[in-house]
């Protein structure tokens, strides 16, 4: 049995990650705003991929390709920017992570009688889609699966509607939660599927089912999500191409820069090879159009929009493009703090505390075209980005060990419960 386990782990380890041969990751620290600004041109110059951006209060982590490492180090040393090695061999670290995932899979296989659940491990897209179909078939009185569209590569973009009144009661507020806009943020989809589980399979808050209508979209970006399992673990964007010949080499757009609110004005890129490429136009991506259409279809009753990202233990609200505050800033902050407080009371002690605030001010940089800002701009009163927790600013921040997935799902659900009830109170006033 032990021999078979070793063979299984080896098969996982050597199956992928060749794209990251020779890559390293670095901790990067900045002491001044000028140093933070000096990093910006290096992103394009050296094709840097920041897993987390540095601020004056915390280090960031950046991935660097082998051909750029010497130049990158030389430039940041010249600018007085501090750095240290985070992972000397990114490929080897990813192989170790794969072992943890496979061990978790084997452990849960026995616990769940062979059934793969989308919230007890980092599961492939097919497992998530099968779960949605299972819920729709087993609970047809309250759950309806919607195949909203096909992704660029032809995969279904599925979401589930949960309602005791078939979405026909105009007095019920609508809660919309999505995940997986950024393909590599693997903790995001489980947090959404756990919410489905709690609303349908393991109901402990009956009022949430009776008094609200729910829309839950676990994977906005199925093409990108699938690609992170088969090719590049740190892929972030969609997988589309366009008339620009460069897009055949550098595919996709950043879904969270593709929404039509001050689109492509700041914190984005016009280069298809950039991880923050805003696309050829607002809503150029079918994936973001699905989110847009859901928001507009139910806008009159849309009381709360949550988009799940990672990482950082943050609850963020508009406006992210310039750091200004919404007219509803007090309400946004009050509800955000209430959600964060209950999450914190249910969190493990080794998880960092949640921070609540304006997106740009908390994360330390501006972005245009986000789903959070767009939803608020069209009239959704409470619109938030959840940056789900990690164990550190390093590897275990971005790639949370799989044994912590269910814990994150549980505590995040408690925040959703509070947010929904607060949103319902405001909706009914």
Swiss-Prot record:
Q: Fetch the InterPro entries from UniProt.
A: M14A-like_propep (IPR036990), M14A_act_pep (IPR003146), Peptidase_M14 (IPR000834)
Q: Which GO terms describe its molecular function?
A: metallocarboxypeptidase activity; zinc ion binding
Residues the entry annotates as binding Zn(2+): 182, 185, 309
UniProt-listed GO biological process terms: proteolysis
Which Gene3D superfamilies would you find in this protein's record? Metallocarboxypeptidase-like, Zn peptidases
Q: Which residues form the signal peptide?
A: 1-15
State the disulfide connectivity. 250-273
State its location(s): Secreted
| Broad class of enzyme this protein falls into | hydrolase
Q: Which UniProt keywords apply?
A: Carboxypeptidase, Disulfide bond, Hydrolase, Metal-binding, Metalloprotease, Protease, Secreted, Signal, Zinc
Please describe what this protein does.
Metalloprotease which cleaves a single amino acid from the C-terminal end of polypeptide chains. Shows a strong preference for peptides with a terminal lysine residue.
Q: Please name the PANTHER family in this protein's record.
A: FI02848P-RELATED, PROTEASE FAMILY M14 CARBOXYPEPTIDASE A,B
Q: What is this protein called?
A: Carboxypeptidase B
- Organism annotation: Helicoverpa zea
């Amino acid at each position: 049995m032990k021999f078979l386990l070793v063979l299984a782990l080896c098969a996982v380890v050597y199956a992928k990650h060749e794209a990251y041969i020779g890559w390293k990751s670095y901790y990067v620290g900045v002491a001044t705003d000028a140093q933070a600004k000096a990093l910006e041109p290096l992103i394009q110059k050296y094709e840097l991929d920041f897993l987390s951006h540095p601020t004056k209060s915390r280090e960031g982590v950046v991935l660097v390709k082998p051909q750029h490492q010497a130049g990158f180090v030389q430039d940041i040393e010249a600018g007085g920017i501090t750095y240290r090695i985070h992972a000397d061999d990114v490929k080897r670290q990813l192989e170790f992570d794969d072992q943890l995932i496979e061990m978790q899979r084997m452990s849960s296989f026995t616990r769940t009688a062979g059934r793969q659940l989308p919230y007890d491990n980092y599961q492939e897209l097919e497992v998530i889609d099968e779960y949605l179909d299972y819920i729709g078939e087993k609970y047809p009185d309250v759950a309806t699966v919607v195949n909203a569209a096909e992704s660029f590569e032809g995969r279904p973009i599925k979401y589930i509607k949960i309602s005791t009144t078939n979405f026909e009661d105009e007095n019920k507020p609508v809660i919309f939660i999505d995940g997986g806009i950024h393909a590599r943020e693997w903790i995001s989809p489980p947090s959404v599927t756990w919410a489905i589980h709690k609303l349908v399979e393991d109901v402990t808050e009956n009022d949430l089912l009776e008094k609200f209508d729910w829309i839950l979209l676990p994977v906005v970006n199925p093409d990108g999500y699938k690609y992170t399992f088969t090719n590049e673990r740190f892929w972030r964007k969609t997988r589309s191409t366009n008339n620009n010949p460069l897009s055949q080499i550098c595919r996709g757009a950043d879904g969270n820069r593709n929404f039509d609110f001050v689109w492509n004005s700041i914190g984005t890129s016009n280069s298809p090879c950039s991880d923050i490429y805003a696309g050829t136009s607002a809503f150029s991506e079918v994936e973001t159009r699905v989110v847009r259409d859901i928001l507009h279809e139910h806008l009159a009753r849309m009381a709360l929009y949550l988009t799940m990202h990672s990482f950082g233990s943050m609850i963020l609200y508009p406006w992210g493009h310039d750091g200004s505050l919404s007219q509803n800033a007090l309400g946004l902050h009050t509800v955000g703090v209430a959600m964060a407080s209950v999450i914190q009371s249910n969190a493990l002690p080794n998880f960092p505390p949640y921070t609540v605030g304006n997106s740009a001010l908390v994360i330390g940089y501006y972005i245009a075209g986000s789903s959070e800002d767009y939803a608020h701009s069209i009239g959704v009163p409470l619109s938030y980005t959840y940056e789900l927790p990690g164990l550190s600013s390093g590897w275990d921040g971005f790639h949370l060990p799989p044994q912590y997935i269910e814990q994150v799902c549980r505590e995040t659900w408690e925040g959703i419960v509070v947010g929904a009830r607060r949103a319902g109170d405001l909706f009914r006033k």
